[in-house]
């Protein structure tokens, strides 16, 4: 499922290509590439629920509030997100890339993934995918993209 999400993001979204709204054709195309039907369905369902999640969280939390808070993770969240991942989320909050709202969306969507543990590289992709899909997050998406993809270029001698 996660591989399907990454493929969709790299192929259709990040490359600037038009993504087909026709889920039947998209599903067929992904199957032809070699993805399993089960993984395709889960990935598309995950993206659909991202939309629902955004609406629910943004309607329940005042967007003007962007206080830094200490997030208390549940045992399940701690199991899925190791200390490096939780530290990275805090780091993104401190850089004002994540707000309270986007942090909660990211954690909720991570918990919905059908993987037992998320590593730091997977987390970076998940955050990119989510920020790209949230209206109004274009600036922080670009900031994160520059941080992740241009950081290594700047430190190479």
Curated annotation (Swiss-Prot):
Disulfide partners: none
The organism's taxonomic lineage, starting at the top: Bacteria, Pseudomonadati, Pseudomonadota, Gammaproteobacteria, Enterobacterales
Protein name: Protein Smg
HAMAP family per UniProt: Smg (MF_00598)
Coiled coil location: none
Protein family membership: Belongs to the Smg family.
Pfam families named among the record's database cross-references: DUF494
PANTHER family: PROTEIN SMG
